[in-house]
Amino acid sequence: MLNIIVCVKVVTDPEAPATTFKIDPEGKHVVPAPGVPPVLNPYDENSLEAALKIKEAQPARITVISAGRAIPRSVIKKSLAVGADDLIIIEDEAFQETDSYITAFILATAVKKVGTFDLVLTGRMAADTNAGQVGQGIAELLGIPAVTDARKIEVGNGKVRVERVRADGYEIAASSIPCLVTVSHEMGNLRSATVKGLMAVQKQPFTVWNVADLAITLPAGRSQARRLFIPAREVNCEIVPGETPEAAGANLAIKLRETSRF
């Protein structure tokens, strides 16, 4: 049986209108407006869907791991409702300020604590940072190969075969297992939970760890936000005169040539 670990992050809904967000220039972080809900990171949902597809093809056990300062249970338990077997929540006030390296360190430590694993899946990046560094960081800390940007994953005979997304198509990569794979949105959306799944998850147990349970001291971060701001936008509007549409068009062409925009 394959043991698959899926690392999932809870983020502020990336589909919320950008105008509802504000910037805290002192704390250097984005402040969502009240009422904007937390959701599973869409790319991590893609990785969970990849795990479920593998489980449909062969015997497998899926363990979801999520780390954060305060993880909403109603959101993260969606992973159990759609078919994951186990859920591990790593929660600690010490996670208030974490960068990609610290996050990768926490998750890699948790994976080691879980023990046996064949495949670790993550989203290609988080929707709230777009950094795309945690997956590769976990692989480095675990000392296992990493294959990125998967749109299809097949596992068999001790190897994983991955179709990797490229700008001009895709390429095929193969690796021995254990291996980490980051998953792109081309894998497909996460399936909806069934009524049976939603009911079962209400009684399904899950595990909660903190820093003490992991027996670690958090390392210092390796990146720092220097400035976070909303770029100033200057909009200039000029009315091109013309007594007729033809004249206005001719004047517009002249204007574009004068400003080197045409």
Question: What are the residue ranges of the model-derived segments?
Answer:
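N-terminal glycine-rich FAD/FM-binding segment characteristic of electron-transfer flavoproteins
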Residues: 1-262
